[in-house]
Amino acid sequence: MTDPLLDSQPASSTGEMDGLCPELLLIPPPLSNRGILGPVQSPCPSRDPAPIPTEPGCLLVEATATEEGPGNMEIIVETVAGTLTPGAPGETPAPKLPPGEREPSQEAGTPLPGQETAEEENVEKEEKSDTQKDSQKAVDKGQGAQRLEGDVVSGTESLFKTHMCPECKRCFKKRTHLVEHLHLHFPDPSLQCPNCQKFFTSKSKLKTHLLRELGEKAHHCPLCHYSAVERNALNRHMASMHEDISNFYSDTYACPVCREEFRLSQALKEHLKSHTAAAAAEPLPLRCFQEGCSYAAPDRKAFIKHLKETHGVRAVECRHHSCPMLFATAEAMEAHHKSHYAFHCPHCDFACSNKHLFRKHKKQGHPGSEELRCTFCPFATFNPVAYQDHVGKMHAHEKIHQCPECNFATAHKRVLIRHMLLHTGEKPHKCELCDFTCRDVSYLSKHMLTHSNTKDYMCTECGYVTKWKHYLRVHMRKHAGDLRYQCNQCSYRCHRADQLSSHKLRHQGKSLMCEVCAFACKRKYELQKHMASQHHPGTPAPLYPCHYCSYQSRHKQAVLSHENCKHTRLREFHCALCDYRTFSNTTLLFHKRKAHGYVPGDQAWQLRYASQEPEGAMQGPTPPPDSEPSNQLSARPEGPGHEPGTVVDPSLDQALPEMSEEVNTGRQEGSEAPHGGDLGGSPSPAEVEEGSCTLHLEALGVELESVTEPPLEEVTETAPMEFRPLGLEGPDGLEGPELSSFEGIGTSDLSAEENPLLEKPVSEPSTNPPSLEEAPNNWVGTFKTTPPAETAPLPPLPESESLLKALRRQDKEQAEALVLEGRVQMVVIQGEGRAFRCPHCPFITRREKALNLHSRTGCQGRREPLLCPECGASFKQQRGLSTHLLKKCPVLLRKNKGLPRPDSPIPLQPVLPGTQASEDTESGKPPPASQEAELLLPKDAPLELPREPEETEEPLATVSGSPVPPAGNSLPTEAPKKHCFDPVPPAGNSSPTEAPKKHHLDPVPPAGNSSPTEALKKHRFEQGKFHCNSCPFLCSRLSSITSHVAEGCRGGRGGGGKRGTPQTQPDVSPLSNGDSAPPKNGSTESSSGDGDTVLVQKQKGARFSCPTCPFSCQQERALRTHQIRGCPLEESGELHCSLCPFTAPAATALRLHQKRRHPTAAPARGPRPHLQCGDCGFTCKQSRCMQQHRRLKHEGVKPHQCPFCDFSTTRRYRLEAHQSRHTGIGRIPCSSCPQTFGTNSKLRLHRLRVHDKTPTHFCPLCDYSGYLRHDITRHVNSCHQGTPAFACSQCEAQFSSETALKQHALRRHPEPAQPAPGSPAETTEGPLHCSRCGLLCPSPASLRGHTRKQHPRLECGACQEAFPSRLALDEHRRQQHFSHRCQLCDFAARERVGLVKHYLEQHEETSAAVAASDGDGDAGQPPLHCPFCDFTCRHQLVLDHHVKGHGGTRLYKCTDCAYSTKNRQKITWHSRIHTGEKPYHCHLCPYACADPSRLKYHMRIHKEERKYLCPECGYKCKWVNQLKYHMTKHTGLKPYQCPECEYCTNRADALRVHQETRHREARAFMCEQCGKAFKTRFLLRTHLRKHSEAKPYVCNVCHRAFRWAAGLRHHALTHTDRHPFFCRLCNYKAKQKFQVVKHVRRHHPDQADPNQGVGKDPTTPTVHLHDVQLEDPSPPAPAAPHTGPEG
């Protein structure tokens, strides 16, 4: 049976106090010492089964935010315990039932066997008694009547960091235990039984109580018919009735008499009765226990009479009711009486007859041999159980649980258990619906939300709906403008930690690499995408087709956005500030940011925008009935950075993929919980955050498709971050509330469940380019360069800092000298953790993560070379391998020679005698005819070509949009092989403009240049990608495909791109002067289908050639007639000479004809060389030269290898330049900066770029200049490629992107920077002066440039240390950055590992050979041995490195004391304690110390910064110890207690002085002048000042001298008008504290403690001795002699 009352109870436990509302209504009992508050209405609806009416006795309880965060609420309820009825809160509690009576509800239960019924009654009685005791304890605790053993002593609350009851000061291990305990003091009306009006402390106890009243017994015994309400009752039943089955309550009890064991305590007691009965049945004769008396009597009375009359002793009877034994003393009787107890502790002499008392004793534990001291408080004990109980309760918030495998520590044991699973790799919790596994059940509960469709959290600003509350809280940061995460390398800011982590990868290298093809990337999802697309063994991801056209995509969201933008256009977005319209919400957001200056998070801008937004703009259009919106909606996984209503145009991904920004990389594997610093733990669902609300949404009436994980290909690759003004870098996808369009219930899933990976706003090229008059100029001021402070010339480093660095180095080296002197002992010990060794190099570390990072990025030996799949050549960079495959691979050169690709049109070329290409025509078969390659481009594809300047000498081609010409001028369309004509221009004529077209007649461009139109013929645009027509290459950027077909297309080039290699595939037509035409790489282009024709202006001297035969002519009409008549090659198959009408049936005859009749076409280099390379055009006369050529050029042999790494090359000078990186020898330094180079060419390029800044190459379209031709090529491809839609308003330059225009404006038209307020540039009028040479500069930028060029600062590039001269810098580099030098040769290395490797390879065997040749007794035996293995060597550095591989380390032990350390510097600093050496001196005062850390600590005295602030009174100090000491004045805590007396103090030094002066009799410090002895050195120094007439403390104002520093500080106040001390009882102020104390005693005699009436102004600065003391005082008092130990 079920009870509706139980079903109506809330599901969540009351222990979740964070989920409660900030205000509660509780009914307190009548109190005698508290007032009655008025009624307060609660804003929270009650969910209790019996609503309690508001009565006059209600008490308001408020919630306060905890320290963990503003979202966590901690409720402190201040009332006392009591049992009340809902109707009458002022009534007394209900009368309790007598112990013998039972409640009516209990009698209604099912009768049980006698033993079970009695056992359950005992349980109920125990519960009643426990409840009565708890209530009584609560009342007693409220009145302060008693204190438990584990309670905190009043006044020491701040010492313990735990869960403490505010009423009775009791501590608990868990917060839930405290919350449950608080219900004793403050009864919860929701935990009151509606039948008996009894209060309980938890819902589980209330539920058990209700089940017991109803008689529902859910726990059944599997072996009998017994059933119980509680599980514990069933356990007790199993232990008592079924002994054979092991149970929690099953235990063994031994008989103290015969040691027989029993499982039941009752059986033991019955057994003990048998011993007593046996003793009573057969009583033994009583013998006198007095010495020398042999009296014995069976009669008890006679024996007692004998003792009394004979010995005068009264016998003591055993206290047991049935034991007849008699004893002489009470102690002997008590010792015997314990044998009647059933339970005896095996560890001590404790015995009892109560089983629960015996169990309680065992739980308390027993003291051990070792004293256990608490590390957080003075508690100490020998009992490990008491110690664990103390730490667990009193310091529950401390990190007391330590991982034995690593340094992880936590305050919660469950967290440690979960952490331990990291080391074992176990994931015990598995999802029942998928393969997801996790380590903690909380992770599994969060994961289960991925399988549900309920989204209970919705943003009130924009309608964003999600399943996780944490996602909503992170999402609300967008609306609040909380961009809390900022990149430390640029100005990027975002609101999510995972976005920042993804962004930081832009500043890093490519650390991830594919193991199959060496593909490198930065992000893990990129590698997964690559593996899935390139090496996935299964079927590829499915393609989602468009319902209206042939568009397909693997991303379903891209298809939906495509349909909306291209076909349906159901959702259109309008800008309220202009006429801009788009079908993509992200594009609208990007428009607002660029056109109207919207900054994400600017709420004022959003309000202004909302005021101008027309009504109804927030509502989306209603889809027509014939559309198909329902089957296109799918639930997508959402993220915190998601924005609703986002529709992404797929054309943006197709045409402008480089504009896409970074994506979310914070997905968990199998889970959607976000990663990051602040996304680590999801709060409980009961938490309520400001700015959000919790909604319980009903199920929608729309059937959605199943939720599927997006494929890996859905993640787009991150493009480089574009140049944006400061302040515009916002979070991904951030948009204001006015940008969202909540489409209603029917489409809310689409708007709320957009893929977070596609929500990033991207820019869309404007279809209407702005005119010059409309071009905005406001962005020019955005990029004004203000002179930063750090670019100013930095002052040289002070001498003290350089001295400190030198002393630190000396301290590290001095440790070896201390070992040799015998003052320090060095031993090798086995480390705690094992060492990790790299198998490919000598690298050793103790951290596994460091080894993994080294293996991925730093290991030179592990870096697997990139191998060519054809010839096996190895490369270190992907760039070198790509260049090798494109141009240099001999295998590919042989394969591609004479074997054109079937998809590229390669017309037959004329054969020149004596060339390699002439062999291709020996077969006599004509090559395949050319095929047209249509360029499938959309109408909006950005394929405009760059404009050329007007000064070009060549005539420009004009593209005409005229209709189709007459039939007579058009070519027949039914013969596609006969309508492509290639006019061949003469060599050397180049036209930088677009290749003209007229009647599909394409002139062949000259050598060395390829026109943009020719590039269009070589690629096509299909489904968002640019495809090369000559090879399988495809890409997303127009500039990439243009560069590919112009430079790197392997299929178009055929056999080679090397110098001297004959081109076999291009169409070569010899001209009249004997020159050859340049190669032609692409196929011809057909008409786009609209009938447009291109007018061609024929170049002078150009020839037209037939693409299917060698025919060529100078007139177009002759070529057209030739095509109409037909090529003879197609009919007869004869070969034609391209220079004359000669035809031949075979290729050999044609070659013989060309050699005899046209000798000018043959190579004009004299006689034919003897040897010719079969793979290239190289010729030579000697076989050795040819063999060397083939080894270097075609076989990939690199004979010159670096001895320090895997670098190899074919040139010796490259090896020498490379080796200078390792040795530092032969580096060529720059005379103007600290950089060095291996070759003079790199140095010259560096001087051109950095120092001279004299460019050598210039862009013909704008003002850009560079130092290499590649710079200009890259600039043209990126800034002038496509439509020049952005024109400069101040000059004639035009660009294809706004970013290029901004960069041009900064270069060519910079505005003078406005100086910051208060800067020197603003305060000083006129030009700026150089501080070194006095040069006048008009602007700070020019001054910085002048300083950088004329007065360069010599700075080390590795450590940024400045030097006055070039020689000092060179010496610094040799000593510091090549500090590891070989003692036997001139070798030097930057790292210690390199020197170790050098010793092993060069000098270990040599040293052994020299030792063997000396003829010593131990010849050949190395002097150094490894203590862990048989390794031997002769160099200490090698031995240390080897020992580190065993996990061992060197330990330095002081021979004067027990101090030991692993650090060489620390042992040096420690040794100075015994020697008194103090090399570190303060450069501002006479202070000196032994180690630099003390000096750094001392230097705070000379700084005014006080970063430690007291939260109580505002007191500021420089050291944290001062703040801790000051805080004890507010808390009254004195944690330092003398172990020998009751002395307590709040300072450790005061306790040390107390112990030395009060509890030490030895006076080791003696005065040499008077013979008086002292216990501390401080007292001796103070005493020595009495013998000295010197007064070292002199006032710097009046030159008055003082003997004590305090006297000078007090005197200094007389020279000021400050009165820091004041009376708290009146307005009296004084300069000294004793004056105020004297005033209080005189004028306020009623004040018990005069010191309590003294106050100090916290704003008054502290008087420091060095501020008021004269710089050259008299010499100080003589130092105390070292006559004893240090005090």
Curated annotation (Swiss-Prot):
Keywords from UniProt, A to Z, are:
Disease variant, DNA-binding, Intellectual disability, Isopeptide bond, Metal-binding, Nucleus, Phosphoprotein, Repeat, Transcription, Transcription regulation, Ubl conjugation, Zinc, Zinc-finger
List where Low complexity composition bias occurs.
725-739, 1082-1092
Name the Gene Ontology biological process terms. Answer: regulation of transcription by RNA polymerase II
Q: Where in the cell is it found?
A: Nucleus
Which residues span the membrane?
A: none
Top-rank taxon, per record: Eukaryota
Q: Zinc finger spans (C2H2-type)? A: 163-185, 219-242, 253-275, 286-311, 316-340, 343-366, 372-395, 401-423, 429-451, 457-479, 485-507, 512-536, 544-567, 573-596, 1135-1158, 1171-1194, 1200-1222, 1228-1251, 1257-1280, 1286-1309, 1328-1351, 1354-1377, 1380-1403, 1424-1446, 1452-1474, 1480-1502, 1508-1530, 1536-1559, 1565-1587, 1593-1615, 1621-1643
Sequence positions bearing Phosphoserine: 154
GO cellular component assignments: nucleus
Is the keyword Repeat in the record? yes
Q: Into which family does the record put it?
A: Belongs to the krueppel C2H2-type zinc-finger protein family.
Medical condition linked: Neurodevelopmental disorder with impaired speech and hyperkinetic movements: An autosomal recessive disorder characterized by global developmental delay, impaired intellectual development, delayed walking, poor or absent speech, and a hyperkinetic movement disorder with dystonia, tremor, ataxia, or chorea. Some patients develop seizures.
Give the protein name, as stated in the record.
Zinc finger protein 142
Q: Which organism is it from?
A: Homo sapiens
Question: What is the name of the gene encoding this protein?
Answer: ZNF142
